[in-house]
């Protein structure tokens, strides 16, 4: 495949998003990633099924460029295979609770006994140390415990974001940490643990809100889509849809006032002197912007705001996002084949481009156990030994 991480072998014991997407990012830039699954397929393979075999949209998104083997690591024979595999690896990714890592012998001490310079990248729900360190959780626990859900929507009921931003943010942090650990190992020869946590990620994303609360005790309450620290910042109805407009900073506000044709009104009123004042008086500004948008189609509003260099975008359905001319022209999505799909899957490339050494989606996601025989043969197992492991239910 090539890439900046060519020669790095990663074992992906991850499940769902935080671990697997971390490994995906490493694979996209050249690492050899081997996904290790249960014999009958791990649960995350089948989330939101779209294929004849039950493979889901999430699996297709976060498992391109990977090999896949099946293995039962809870047996002695499975442990033997795993130790041989670990001995060839640079990184193990496993977003599993500490007690599960210990039971599977994927804890750092066990891995280090086999490969002294191994890097273990792991992510838990709550991190630690702390009274909740051994508890399990998904993306939503980070959202609800960071202040994000409290501040989303109108407050009753609170709303969790539909997109798993905590999981994906944790994957990004873990990939960054893994790269840093690989650089350090190149200098010192030492491996280490890279530890992410869903709650830590969520708190890092909401941190400015927490700082404001801690320092000045502002006690903000949710206000729907209406921004609270600048204006206009809201989602507005147009003649045929909805459009977002976000204005932060006085230069942008001056552009907006000029576009409204009311510079004297908006730029000389002390209620709108700076961002926080505009945020405090957001409903007044938003009402004016709402009237402006209501007179236009979404396309007219977006084009006019865009030409004025005011941040804006249309509210798109998933199908509209797929069809949007800029998204298509930019090549953010790559059509990928997979056995049993009625059509190609539009898989999002890594959202960062390197000018000289770009990442690539070089291979489709693997079928269950597609590379088991090949990987085991590389470890020294002959056909008879592989057949015996399969007969015994180890692979």
Residue ranges and their predicted role:
Residues 1-177, 181-187, 367, 373-395:
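N-terminal helix-loop segment corresponding to the beta1-alpha1 unit
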Residues 306-330:
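Conserved PLP cofactor-binding pocket of PLP-dependent enzymes
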Residues 341-388:
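Flexible, small-/acidic-enriched active-site or ligand-binding loops
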Residues 128, 155-166, 186-202, 221-228, ...:
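Conserved Rossmann-fold dehydrogenase catalytic segment
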Residues 164-179, 198-206, 248, 252:
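Mid-domain beta-loop-alpha active-site segment that forms a flexible
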Residues 171-191, 204-215, 257-263, 267-268:
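Oxidoreductase and adenylate-handling cofactor-binding alpha/beta cores
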